[in-house]
């Protein structure tokens, strides 16, 4: 895929660091990446183009739109990823009526406007760096959260993987080194001012506390008059509080380890915690206090103090700051707890997983931009010669199945498999050749009558289907439900499974022995089931297994992430999921097909409006 990162930088910010980090990983993955911005203040390996993205001139904005439209056409750009309000607005107009998708990352509060309420300028999907940003967008703009993903800033944890606890132990706040890292502009300027003023008011509590300003200066924070007064105050208290200024272009674990505690938010808070340094979360909106192993998720929701839907400026209570400093002092004597926090942060913010999620979101956005309708995904099980006893009605007789195929043919449907969808989604096949009326036929379990009855009929009518097969090749029948409410039904087993290779079916995974995802003791066991079944089937059939079907349609919170982590590209449910296929490709809605389907029921279940109708009726 060809990607453009669109920024409006006039100085270095976290958004540019974030964009260059994404670009570097995407280049490693073989993507072609461009970076467009007013200026460049962080090294980038993407192809850079200067463009006045941030402009107050309407004429310049219109010129930018036409220039960018020409650029995406000339370079065959699949996705524009915007990283600022100005970039999102430009990206929106530049991609109108094109095949290029648009995704925006929102790092903080968005100012309300009538135009944003009337139509979504942020693209097919919005990435928010924390839950509070997502809440503000949904509340103030009325956006549907189905197209918003909370994905944290990726961090190269390898820079911080040499965790070593501080050897020196402090017994009080004497000789304590505290750092405030980050720029001193906007609300963060006020944050820094509040901390310094609080420490001055409480200087009698210290003997030798050293405050390091990293990336900012006192002159950035205070007026000339207040700066003179401040320096006089510092001279009067002598060694109780010392303030130093330092410029570090790129912070690493070795920097953080020289400080006893760090005050920061966003990326700074994450990096400090990863380094094993006591971290006090204080950002543009909130003083969250000391980061502990119990409040990581809570603090992540505000991006460690940077965002609250209803708070616009930071405030600080002296006692809260002193309590956090004392907690940091105690933490210095508990390096094991710092290590636990570092490991938890590593799990959440590790860059590899986040880069993979964003890349997959690009693909979903590209697919949604080019085909935004619901694609019917029908679910079959058994295709017996004649009627059978089945309490769950999970069969269609061979004669009726042929009627279904005749109906699909007469309605002009073209069947697709998930591997074919993948080729369109990743830009390997142009959407110019995408079928006008796509249809996905799926079969579960691997019954013999699928091979004997369904496959020949599918071939006869020029159709193909997806078979979700159990990885245990020794299973000979439906042991999970036979004897109670379903008759025993033969499953293709042993060496006969090789016959699937020449059938009308593409293989997907249905687990190993038909256990529901909720049957496993913990997440690791469930993940192993998905990975192991995938590996077995790939070894057996000799091609990548791209899709997974949750047994019984049973899922649990995080099931979609499990399928993603296991390496699948799609996962299907039974009667719940996204309103479109790529809204959540790991929770795909399937339509149950029953023995008594007729022309009108099939017409309803394959109509483009059916999924939304089902959702409004069943609320799932």
Residue ranges and their predicted role:
Residues 4, 170-200, 211-212:
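Conserved donor-binding/catalytic core segment of Leloir-type glycosyltransferases
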Residues 14, 165, 310-363:
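A charged, aromatic-enriched C-terminal amphipathic alpha-helix characteristic of glycosyltransferases
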Residues 82-88, 106:
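Short His-centered aromatic/hydrophobic patch
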Residues 370-442, 448-449, 518-620:
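C-terminal active-site subregion of NodB/CE4 polysaccharide deacetylases
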Residues 139, 146, 154-170, 186-190:
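Acidic anion/phosphate-binding donor-loop and adjacent secondary structure
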Residues 123-148, 155-159:
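A short, active-site helix/loop in glycosyltransferases that binds the activated sugar's phosphate group
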Residues 5-62, 215-226:
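N-terminal strand-loop element at the rim of the active site
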Residues 223-248:
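Nucleotide-activated donor-binding/catalytic signature segment of Leloir-type glycosyltransferases, i.e.
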């Amino acid at each position: 895929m060809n990607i453009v990162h669109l920024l409006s930088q006039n100085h270095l910010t976290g958004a540019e660091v974030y964009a260059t980090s994404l670009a570097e990983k995407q280049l490693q993955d073989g993507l072609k990446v461009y970076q467009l911005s007013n200026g460049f203040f962080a090294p980038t390996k993407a192809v850079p183009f200067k463009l006045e993205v941030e402009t107050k001139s309407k004429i310049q904005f219109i010129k930018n739109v036409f220039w960018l439209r020409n650029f995406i056409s000339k370079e065959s750009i699949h996705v524009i990823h915007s990283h600022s309000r100005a970039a999102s607005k430009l990206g929106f107009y530049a991609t109108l009526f094109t095949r290029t998708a648009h995704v925006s990352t929102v790092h903080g509060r968005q100012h309300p406007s009538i135009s944003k309420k009337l139509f979504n300028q942020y693209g097919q999907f919005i990435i928010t760096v924390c839950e509070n940003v997502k809440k503000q967008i949904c509340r103030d703009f009325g956006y549907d959260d189905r197209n918003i993903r909370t994905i944290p800033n990726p961090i190269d944890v390898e820079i911080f993987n040499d965790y070593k606890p501080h050897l020196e132990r402090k017994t009080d706040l004497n000789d304590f080194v505290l750092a405030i890292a980050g720029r001193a502009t906007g609300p963060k300027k006020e944050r820094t001012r509040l901390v310094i003023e609080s420490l001055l008011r409480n200087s009698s509590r210290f003997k030798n506390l050293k405050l390091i300003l990293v990336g900012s200066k006192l002159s950035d924070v205070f007026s000339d008059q207040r700066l003179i007064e401040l320096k006089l105050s510092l001279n009067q208290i002598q060694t109780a509080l010392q303030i130093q200024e330092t410029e570090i272009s790129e912070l690493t674990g070795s920097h953080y380890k020289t400080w006893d505690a760090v005050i920061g938010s966003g990326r700074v808070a994450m990096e400090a915690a990863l380094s094993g340094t006591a971290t006090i979360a204080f950002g543009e909106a909130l003083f969250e206090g000391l980061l502990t192993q119990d409040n990581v998720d809570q603090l992540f929701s505000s991006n460690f103090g940077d965002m609250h839907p209803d708070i616009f400026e930071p405030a600080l209570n002296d006692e809260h700051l002193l309590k956090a400093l004392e907690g940091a002092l105690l933490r210095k004597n508990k390096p094991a707890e710092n290590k636990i926090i570092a490991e938890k942060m590593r799990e959440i913010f590790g860059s590899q997983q986040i880069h993979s999620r964003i890349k997959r979101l690009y693909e979903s956005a590209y697919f949604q931009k080019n085909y935004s309708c619901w694609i019917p995904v029908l679910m079959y099980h058994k295709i017996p010669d004649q009627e059978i006893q089945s309490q769950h009605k999970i069969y269609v007789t061979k004669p009726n199945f042929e009627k279904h195929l005749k109906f699909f043919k007469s309605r002009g449907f073209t069947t697709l498999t998930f591997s074919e969808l993948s080729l369109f989604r990743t830009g390997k096949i142009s959407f110019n050749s995408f079928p006008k009326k796509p249809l996905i036929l799926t079969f579960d379990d691997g019954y013999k009558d699928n091979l004997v009855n369904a496959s020949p009929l599918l071939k006869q009518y020029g159709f193909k289907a997806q078979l979700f097969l159990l990885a245990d090749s020794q299973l000979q029948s439906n042991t999970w439900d036979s004897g109670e409410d379903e008759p025993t039904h033969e499953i293709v087993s042993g060496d006969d499974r090789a016959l699937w290779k020449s059938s009308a079916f593409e293989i997907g995974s249905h687990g190993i022995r038909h256990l529901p995802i909720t049957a496993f003791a913990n997440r690791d066991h469930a993940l192993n089931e998905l990975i192991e079944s995938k590996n077995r089937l790939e070894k057996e059939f000799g091609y990548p297994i791209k899709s997974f079907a949750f047994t019984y349609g049973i899922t649990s919170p995080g099931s979609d992430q499990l399928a993603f982590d296991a390496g699948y590209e799609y996962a299907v449910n039974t009667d719940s999921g996204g309103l479109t296929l790529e809204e959540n490709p790991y929770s795909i809605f399937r339509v149950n097909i029953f023995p008594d389907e007729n022309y009108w029921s099939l017409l309803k279940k394959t109509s483009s409006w059916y999924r939304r109708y089902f959702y409004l009726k069943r609320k799932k």
